[in-house]
């Protein structure tokens, strides 16, 4: 009598089963190659401020430190003298700035302190998912670029401080409201002496401004100086890491599609 197989004795099908590997589709990050359409803030009163500015009756906040840099004046390399006779080539005459001399202040700070963001930050900041440093308590606003128009002149600068006069006006900075501030004719942006001079402004004027992605900014005097300047230090390009992450995602998506195709054959 021949031997009885395990399958015959048990009645079970022991045909080898093909194991299909589990495939998970990678989660898509924000696409950094899709331009964000930033809206213009039109007819905004602009005032001038500078690194090292001393407090006055009308402006009680000294500018040796910024909202995000407690050693702002030291890191810049000195006093950013606004006197036109003390400036050359859109920078201080007496030293080469170590930070970009083309800077602005806008009336919003995304931080509560060095450990925590404001609750609305993730909802209202357009580039939140593209920010370079995603740790808690690290600002996503410092260093972002703005485009400023005054008459026929167009200038570019980095956001490096908060003001004028308030730090919580996200409805204006990221929305469609007018500035909350009522002082200095409702000023909604502070400009550095370099920005002032390039635009041909006095110490107060009217401008249009908007945020702009770094990849769209042409070279100019705003690209010459500064360890905080991605023209000088490409590692600081705020969208560089986002582009790298997105390319990794696309490669993973390609690899998963290839494995899926092979498993079906």
List the model feature ranges, each with a label.
Residues 1-3:
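Bacterial N-terminal signal peptides
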Residues 6-265:
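Secreted/periplasmic proteins
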